């Protein structure tokens, strides 16, 4: 990424009310928390912990009056953990990605399948874009009703590279799904690549928002 491109990303992040350090700190803390998991935890626990703690960090810091003015809002409706901009202009959720997270020369998709509610949110992103409305149409107050479903949703995508162990991240706005996977984006803002988080975060990282979880049952001797 060139210097001018990096400057454009920084400017766009500022418009969205966030900065790279927030996301870097969130992922670092999530990694530290996930590393506490052991072989006695459920097989997917490290991935779930990493996902949950990343979203928790964003929520705790963006809703803290000592760190943010005005504060953001938070909701876990439909099992989709979201922080909502004070104006109600957009929301952000952290999910794992796959492909080329952070590399605009490569395609990227959500790592894990998404359910009916997420599919509707992605579709609403496209409708909002086509309507010609700006991303920053202010509201005096966000009521978590229909407004939450219609506001643009951004993904903080993260991915661990299996070859060198680096953790890459980007902030992107989804616009289309293929099957249960988000694979097309209106905007992609590369953030950074960081050192190995020290664990496999490529496992299931969130409950399906349709409410049905699948568990593999193995017979032991």
Feature roles, as predicted:
Residues 60-64, 72-73, 144-148, 161:
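Short, solvent-exposed secondary-structure boundary motifs
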Residues 140-221:
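Glycine-rich, aromatic-bearing surface loops/beta-hairpins
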Residues 99-162:
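Catalytic cores of nucleic-acid endonucleases
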Residues 37-40, 46-69:
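Short N-terminal edge-element motif at the start of the domain
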């Amino acid at each position: 990424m060139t210097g001018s491109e990096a400057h454009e990303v920084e400017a766009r992040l500022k418009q969205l009310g966030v900065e790279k350090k927030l996301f870097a700190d969130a992922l670092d803390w999530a990694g530290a928390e996930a590393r506490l998991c052991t072989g006695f935890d459920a097989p997917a626990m490290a991935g779930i912990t990493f996902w949950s703690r990343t979203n928790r960090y964003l929520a705790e810091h963006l809703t803290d009056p000592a760190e943010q003015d005005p504060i953001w809002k938070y909701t876990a409706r439909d099992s989709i953990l979201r922080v909502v901009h004070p104006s109600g202009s957009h929301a952000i959720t952290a999910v794992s990605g796959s492909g080329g997270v952070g590399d605009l020369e490569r395609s990227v998709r959500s790592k894990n399948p998404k359910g009916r509610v997420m599919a509707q949110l992605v579709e609403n992103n496209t409708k909002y874009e086509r309507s010609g409305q700006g991303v920053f149409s202010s509201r005096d107050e966000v009521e978590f009703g229909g407004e939450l479903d219609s506001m643009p949703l951004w993904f903080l995508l993260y991915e661990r590279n299996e070859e060198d162990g680096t953790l890459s991240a980007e902030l992107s706005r989804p616009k289309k799904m293929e099957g249960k996977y988000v694979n097309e984006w209106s905007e992609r803002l590369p953030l950074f690549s960081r050192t190995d988080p020290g664990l496999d975060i490529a496992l299931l990282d969130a409950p399906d928002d349709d409410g049905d979880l699948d568990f593999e049952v193995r017979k032991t001797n």
